[in-house]
């Protein structure tokens, strides 16, 4: 009578092993996935890429990834924009962006500009915030609009005052950079400050 019980026990153990095996494999696979931040970045990119609604509000991570650059590739390199825009996935849905700025500075320094005084800026935007000091960066201007990622840009090295717009982020209760409006090189013989101490862009 003991033999059937032993046989059934072995069969049950084998069945349990088969049932548990996929769960174990799934757990092992998860350990080899990309880091959480990379997966989140991919999900954000795909959501923005496929979205038909308005552009999502900026986040610190988004600005850091798309705007802030580290020392490395020479800023004077004529292919700088072509390489960096492709590497950082700087696109607007299915289209190439018409212009973009890369800034050689820390994000915290950029965020502090949001609390500087308002100044006029380009493209009809009334209020921008200006950096107090000069910043190095690269201005990218679209020259040939192919299907992404084959966008072609002309790169311009600049060292000037950063003009940005900012937006309030409820999650962190802070102003954060929204768009880089311009990187204005100072004129050689004229000041950007008028008699009242207001920053103005000369014609």
UniProtKB/Swiss-Prot annotation:
Superkingdom of origin organism: Eukaryota
GO terms for MF: nucleic acid binding
Record keywords: Disulfide bond, Glycoprotein, Secreted, Signal
Disulfide bonds: 96-151, 114-166, 121-128
One cellular component (GO) term of this entry: extracellular region
SUPFAM superfamilies listed in its UniProt record: RNase A-like
Location relative to the cell: Secreted
Family statement: Belongs to the pancreatic ribonuclease family.
The protein's name in its UniProt record: Inactive ribonuclease-like protein 9
This protein's encoding gene: RNASE9
């Amino acid at each position: 009578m003991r033999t059937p019980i032993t046989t059934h026990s072995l069969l049950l153990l084998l069945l349990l092993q088969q049932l548990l095996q996929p769960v174990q494999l799934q757990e092992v696979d998860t350990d080899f996935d990309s880091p959480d931040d990379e997966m989140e970045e991919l999900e954000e990119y795909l959501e923005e890429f496929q979205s038909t609604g308005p552009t999502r509000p900026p986040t610190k991570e988004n600005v850091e990834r798309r705007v802030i650059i580290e020392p490395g590739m020479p800023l004077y390199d004529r292919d700088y924009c072509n390489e960096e825009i492709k590497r950082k996935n700087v696109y607007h849905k299915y289209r190439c962006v018409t212009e973009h700025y890369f800034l050689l500075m820390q994000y915290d320094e950029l965020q502090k500009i949001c609390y500087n005084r308002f100044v006029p800026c380009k493209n009809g935007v009334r209020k921008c915030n200006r950096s107090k000091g000069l910043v190095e960066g690269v201005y990218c201007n679209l020259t040939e609009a192919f299907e992404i990622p084959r966008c072609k840009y002309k790169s311009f090295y600049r060292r000037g005052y950063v003009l940005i717009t900012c937006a309030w982020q409820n999650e962190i209760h802070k102003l954060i950079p929204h768009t880089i409006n311009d990187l204005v090189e100072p004129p050689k013989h004229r000041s950007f400050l008028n008699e009242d101490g207001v920053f103005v862009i000369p014609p």
